[in-house]
Amino acid sequence: MPLIAISYSHGKLSILNQLFLPHQTTYDPIYSACDAWHAIHDMRVRGAPAIAIVAALSVAVELYDLIQKGKLSDQAKEVEIFIREKLEYIASSRPTAVNLVEAAGRLGKIVVARSCGEGVTGREVAEEYIRAAEKMLEDDVKDNRGIGEFGAKWIMKQAIDGAEGEGEGKGKVAVLTHCNTGSLATAGYGTALGVIRSLHAANSLKHAYCTETRPYNQGSRLTAYELVHDNIPATLITDSMAAALLAHKSAGVGAIVVGADRVAANGDTANKIGTYGLAVLAKHHGVKFLVAAPRTTIDMNTKSGEGIAIEERPRQEMTRIRGPRVGGEQDGLGAMETITVAADGIDVWNPAFDVTPASLIDGIITEIGVVEKDRDGEFHLERVFE
């Protein structure tokens, strides 16, 4: 049974509360754009593609409700303004993720164009928006499978062909990933984790490694959860073990695949904090470093990583950890508790993301193919939009 992080049908939306994973499975209903803002900001739902979809669908839910109650304005312009204001509000919940801003801009243009039609009613504008938002959910899964297939083929050619190997592991590659980029971060299948899934399906995956991903532990809580769910051979490591793993030749790590929250026009990539360090390690150890992201994550309006705003999270997310109390062997897991793990009074710097320079990236995997650098070491990402 596939993992479902976003449940939507006929104007009803709920999200899998990822703060409780992997210990509890709880779905939170989303009734409004305000609900979505808080769910995204609190990281009950996270992952650049997922938060864009939840944002879009939350407005669709509000529109459905207004239509059913007969409270939607008949005026096309009023409905257009209502939608655009809601989208602008939700886009402020997590500023680094470009998918959220891109979706708000794209959907806003759709309703503006529709509202300008002669004789168009407010309901027709709302219905046009709802169709576009629902299509985002459908398209994301299809795009992710494309990313998985293109990424797996690239790795099989670049990281496996010609690589040394003997016995059972010959013709296979081990892959390291960071944070969570799977079904829990998207509408389904995933981006970087989708590449791992595709390698596993092709019997070309020797082993998957996932980092703990401090301080929010998306790797240990979420990625490990997905890998176990799918019965993919995998091992969890702490973030600080990555260098030792890459130096451990028998591990056979041939590629590091990560997701992205924003890719600048030159290929500089903002992703979960710790990604930059992994890219430096990959370069030193001769391991391929790949970014997996749909084209909606590519921001051609931002020339380089210097133009990407980096969100900073509350200090408590670093100094405290929440989880269930561990009982005896027969007792299982107890009630959820929060504990402190840092000295009182210590200052905290907690950026949610870092920016990996394009020079450290071997390829950017999109739903239409893998973009590589030219002979001068530059990406030409405009070509994926031609």
UniProtKB/Swiss-Prot annotation:
Its EC number is 5.3.1.23. Signal peptide: none annotated. InterPro entries: IF-2B-related, IF-M1Pi, IF_2B-like_C, Initiation_fac_2B_a/b/d, M1Pi_N, NagB/RpiA_transferase-like. GO terms for molecular function: S-methyl-5-thioribose-1-phosphate isomerase activity. It is found in: Cytoplasm; Nucleus. The record marks C179 as: Transition state stabilizer. Keywords: Amino-acid biosynthesis, Cytoplasm, Isomerase, Methionine biosynthesis, Nucleus. GO terms for cellular component: cytoplasm; nucleus. Pathway: Amino-acid biosynthesis; L-methionine biosynthesis via salvage pathway; L-methionine from S-methyl-5-thio-alpha-D-ribose 1-phosphate: step 1/6. Belongs to the eIF-2B alpha/beta/delta subunits family. MtnA subfamily. Catalyzes the interconversion of methylthioribose-1-phosphate (MTR-1-P) into methylthioribulose-1-phosphate (MTRu-1-P). This is Methylthioribose-1-phosphate isomerase. It comes from Paracoccidioides brasiliensis (strain Pb03). The lineage of its organism: Eukaryota, Fungi, Dikarya, Ascomycota, Pezizomycotina.
